[in-house]
Amino acid sequence: MPDKFSDHIAEPSVVHVTTRAERRRAFGILFVSLLCMGAGQTVLFNILPPLSRQLHLSAVQTTSVFAVSAAIWVVTATYWGKKSDHWGRKPVMLLGLLSFAASFALFASVMLAGLHNWLPAVAIFPLMIVTRSLYGALGSGTQPASQAYVADRTTPQERLQGVATIGSAFGLGTVAGPAIASLFTPFGLLAPFYFISGLALASAATIWFLLPERTPPRARAPASVSLKWHDRRVLPFALFAVGLSTASTVPIQTMGFFFMDVLHVRPEHAAQYNMIGQLATSLAALFAQLVVVQYARLSSRTMTNLGLGTAFLSCAAFLLFGNFLVLVVGLALSGLGFGLARPGFTTGASLSVAPHEQGAVAGVIGGASAMGFIAGPLIGWMYEWSPYVPYGFAAVLLAGLFVFQWLSPALRNAGIIPPDIEIVEEDLETPVANA
């Protein structure tokens, strides 16, 4: 391998991948599981605000529920990613899904108790924090373990498409979430929570019985090796993830207020405008991950640069125009841009480390990506100055990330595949490792 790339690319090795038929089945199972978690997020975002008013919770308390869980996620995602290197992917996925199911059901039960005065009012908010934090503490392992599972079973050349497919599952879930909420709320405002909790349990059972895992965990992860977030191969990608996730939260957290304050949409109609904007963002992100990434066959670095430029244009739409249709196009550009950039740099991070470090690097990137949600209060403070300030901040941040990518050798060389990697496809008789 050329010396100039030796610091940035994992050492050449033999890559074992499952057969194409088994990969399709396995990735389909993971897709449904992550779709379930994505749907849960949007159900929570859509139902919690009106419920919080009935529970007499302030806006600060409501946003704190998300912020505390996200802060815990930042720490624990790295931990569970490393554990998946030692325990295997399936145990960590199962723990995450079961914790998500328990957290979602318990969170709904606390709100139900509050609505019916079964618990003292003073206990509701702390219990909401605790039950939601269960997801942040234990549920954060599902995504990095799933991404590492994909890395275990794809060649370096296929990695970008595999990572994008798994990432699109969560995005499709965010589109399905409002539909699930509309379908089940006639049975009660909290019915969607219990439905998604049951769906998560069914997904966990499917993973337990049907998901193959052939690589023995101990062979995958030497006990003496522990990837750190400040490892020079990983740190640039982690910093990039923090910046990208922070920029991506700006439209998510402010577009509803922007419609009311800049377009003068009445509050009773703002939810409809917001739903149209969210749908445009989600569908564009899905198009990026399921069509552009899968069929354009661009390198991870090119995909990241294209995503940064497209997301920058979305910020310009908010800064320069005050027309709803133009802003919807801007939100679609936001979804398209971040939908391209995320799998691009995530794949670069995966290819920068060795096979036995895939869980650890997925955890580091997953934790760093959650940092953007912790920045919510900062974005809100900027919005108080002017509705345009957060979008100017996001534009500057995206431009800075573009420059950073060219200045950092690790990011600049991301996605370069060593020519001497040997690909070995497992056959159907290969023993399945115990989960």
Where do the PLM segments sit?
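Juxtamembrane intracellular "pre-TM" segments in multi-pass secondary transporters
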Residues: D7-R24, P212-L239, I423-A435
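Hydrophobic core of transmembrane alpha-helices in multi-pass small-molecule transporters
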Residues: L35, H116-G141, V326-L340
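Short amphipathic helix-loop junctions that connect adjacent transmembrane helices
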Residues: N46-Q61, Q253-Y273
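Transmembrane alpha-helices of Major Facilitator/SLC transporters
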Residues: A71-V75, Y273-A296
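Helix-to-loop junctions at the C-terminal end of transmembrane segments
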Residues: T76-R89, F287-S300, Y383
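C-terminal ends and interior cores of transmembrane alpha-helices
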Residues: L98-A121, T310-G322
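Cytoplasmic helix-loop-helix junction between adjacent transmembrane helices
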Residues: I129-F170
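C-terminal transmembrane helical hairpin of 12-TM major facilitator-type secondary transporters
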Residues: S300-F345
